[in-house]
C-alpha cells in the first residue's frame, strides 16, 4: 500500500473527500500493480489515473469558479503543475514501461504533493464551498 486514506486530511466537503478517497484507492491499486511488475494492468491503471486526475482537477476548478473562490488562480496553478508533471511521467511510462520510475514518482513526488495540496488548498476551498 502506498498511502493509507487516513493520511490525507478530510476537508469537510463530502464530494471532495469522496474524490480524494477514490483517488487514493486508485493510487494504491496502481502502486501494488507496479510492485508486482504487472505492466499490462499498470498500463490500464496509468490511463485511468490520467483521466481521473483531469476529472478531479477540472471539477474542482469549475466549483471554484462557480463559488468565486478568492484563491482560484493559485489553486489552479498547483493543479496545472501536477497535470504537467504527471503527463511527463505518463508519457515516459508509455515509451519505457519502467515500474520503478513510476513508483519513485508516486512515493517521492505525488503523495507528498497530494497531502500538502489537500491540507493547504482543498481544505481552504472546502471551507468556502461548504458541504
Swiss-Prot record:
<keyword id="KW-0479">Metal-binding</keyword>
<comment type="subunit">
    <text>Monomer.</text>
</comment>
<dbReference type="InterPro" id="IPR012312">
    <property type="entry name" value="Hemerythrin-like"/>
</dbReference>
<feature type="binding site">
    <location>
        <position position="23"/>
    </location>
    <ligand>
        <name>Fe cation 1</name>
    </ligand>
</feature>
<feature type="binding site">
    <location>
        <position position="20"/>
    </location>
    <ligand>
        <name>Fe cation 1</name>
    </ligand>
</feature>
<dbReference type="InterPro" id="IPR023504">
    <property type="entry name" value="Bacteriohemerythrin-like"/>
</dbReference>
<feature type="binding site">
    <location>
        <position position="56"/>
    </location>
    <ligand>
        <name>Fe cation 1</name>
    </ligand>
</feature>
<comment type="similarity">
    <text>Belongs to the hemerythrin family.</text>
</comment>
<feature type="binding site">
    <location>
        <position position="60"/>
    </location>
    <ligand>
        <name>Fe cation 2</name>
    </ligand>
</feature>
<dbReference type="InterPro" id="IPR035938">
    <property type="entry name" value="Hemerythrin-like_sf"/>
</dbReference>
<dbReference type="GO" id="GO:0005344">
    <property type="term" value="F:oxygen carrier activity"/>
</dbReference>
<feature type="binding site">
    <location>
        <position position="75"/>
    </location>
    <ligand>
        <name>Fe cation 2</name>
    </ligand>
</feature>
<feature type="binding site">
    <location>
        <position position="79"/>
    </location>
    <ligand>
        <name>Fe cation 2</name>
    </ligand>
</feature>
<protein>
    <recommendedName>
        <fullName>Bacteriohemerythrin</fullName>
    </recommendedName>
</protein>
<keyword id="KW-0813">Transport</keyword>
<feature type="binding site">
    <location>
        <position position="117"/>
    </location>
    <ligand>
        <name>Fe cation 2</name>
    </ligand>
</feature>
<comment type="function">
    <text>Oxygen-binding protein. May be involved in a storage mechanism or for delivery to oxygen-requiring enzymes. The oxygen-binding site contains two iron atoms.</text>
</comment>
<dbReference type="InterPro" id="IPR050669">
    <property type="entry name" value="Hemerythrin"/>
</dbReference>
<dbReference type="InterPro" id="IPR012827">
    <property type="entry name" value="Hemerythrin_metal-bd"/>
</dbReference>
<feature type="binding site">
    <location>
        <position position="122"/>
    </location>
    <ligand>
        <name>Fe cation 1</name>
    </ligand>
</feature>
<feature type="binding site">
    <location>
        <position position="60"/>
    </location>
    <ligand>
        <name>Fe cation 1</name>
    </ligand>
</feature>
<dbReference type="InterPro" id="IPR016131">
    <property type="entry name" value="Haemerythrin_Fe_BS"/>
</dbReference>
<keyword id="KW-0561">Oxygen transport</keyword>
<dbReference type="GO" id="GO:0005506">
    <property type="term" value="F:iron ion binding"/>
</dbReference>
<feature type="binding site">
    <location>
        <position position="122"/>
    </location>
    <ligand>
        <name>Fe cation 2</name>
    </ligand>
</feature>
<keyword id="KW-0408">Iron</keyword>
<dbReference type="Pfam" id="PF01814">
    <property type="entry name" value="Hemerythrin"/>
</dbReference>
Amino acid at each position: 500500500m502506498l498511502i493509507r486514506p487516513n493520511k490525507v486530511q478530510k476537508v469537510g466537503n463530502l464530494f471532495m473527500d469522496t474524490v480524494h478517497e477514490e483517488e487514493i484507492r486508485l493510487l494504491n491499486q496502481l502502486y501494488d500493480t507496479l510492485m508486482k511488475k504487472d505492466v499490462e494492468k499498470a498500463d490500464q491503471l496509468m490511463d485511468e489515473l490520467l483521466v481521473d486526475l483531469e476529472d478531479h482537477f477540472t471539477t474542482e476548478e469549475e466549483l471554484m469558479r462557480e463559488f468565486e473562490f478568492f484563491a482560484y488562480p493559485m489553486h489552479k496553478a498547483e493543479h496545472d503543475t501536477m497535470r504537467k508533471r504527471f503527463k511527463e511521467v505518463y508519457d515516459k511510462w508509455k515509451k519505457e514501461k519502467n515500474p520503478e520510475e513510476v513508483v519513485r514518482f508516486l512515493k517521492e513526488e505525488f503523495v507528498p504533493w497530494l497531502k500538502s495540496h489537500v491540507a493547504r488548498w482543498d481544505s481552504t476551498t472546502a471551507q468556502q464551498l461548504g458541504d
